[in-house]
Design a protein with these regions (language model features):
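Conserved active-site and SAM-binding loop architecture
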Residues: 1-185
Length: 185
């Protein structure tokens, strides 16, 4: 399958699909942190190419509840509305298989409830971080390796230049589940 991983600079999910033989491409305005097929551009430049599946990880800064204390400012300066419209590019995309990943946030009210909320500890990582998935044409992900030792590590990260990137990166176990389960869809 030809798969677009939108707003993914880590390459984690792209690489999981590529390892299973898929023609997977990541796209982000930043360069990819791992070698592989990557478009470094605004995703709108490639979004309407001929894709069999689109998995999107739109920026959550203006949408997630953990940033709610700044919502008034984000509404006033237009950032939140731009982020909503960007999210909806993926929700309204004509591809038959679409997944949109974002933390718990306002899209559950403005768009619709997510199809599922997963936790890293369901996929081999002893951490908590509720992650919503809105799906079309794809099955719910089944847990692959439920582990104990659940810590909210990402919520306790110290401020720093790498914090946002590390908090938003997809866990390897989740990426592998997406590839192994959705790669057959």
């Amino acid at each position: 399958m030809k798969i677009l991983l939108a707003c993914e600079e880590s390459g984690v999910v792209r690489d999981a699909f590529s390892k299973l033989g898929h023609n997977a491409w990541s796209c982000d305005i930043l360069p990819s942190r791992s070698p592989g097929q990557h478009y470094q551009c605004d995703v709108r430049e490639v979004l309407y190419d001929d894709w069999d599946m689109v998995i999107a990880f739109p920026p959550c800064t203006d949408l997630c509840v953990s940033r709610a204390r700044w919502f008034e400012q984000k509404r006033a300066n237009g950032d939140q509305q731009r982020s909503i419209e960007f999210f909806m590019l993926f929700a309204n995309h004509p591809c038959p298989r679409v997944a949109i990943e974002n933390p718990v946030g306002i899209m559950s009210t403005l768009y619709r409830k997510p199809d599922m909320v997963l936790q890293p500890w369901q996929y081999g990582h002893g951490e908590t971080k509720a992650t919503c998935l809105w799906l079309r044409g794809l099955p719910l992900l089944k847990p692959t390796n439920i582990v104990s030792g659940r810590e909210p590590r990402v919520h306790r990260m110290a401020p720093g230049p790498e914090r946002a990137r590390l908090r938003s990166q997809t866990y390897q176990g989740v990426a592998d589940a997406m590839a192994s389960q959705w790669g057959l869809a």
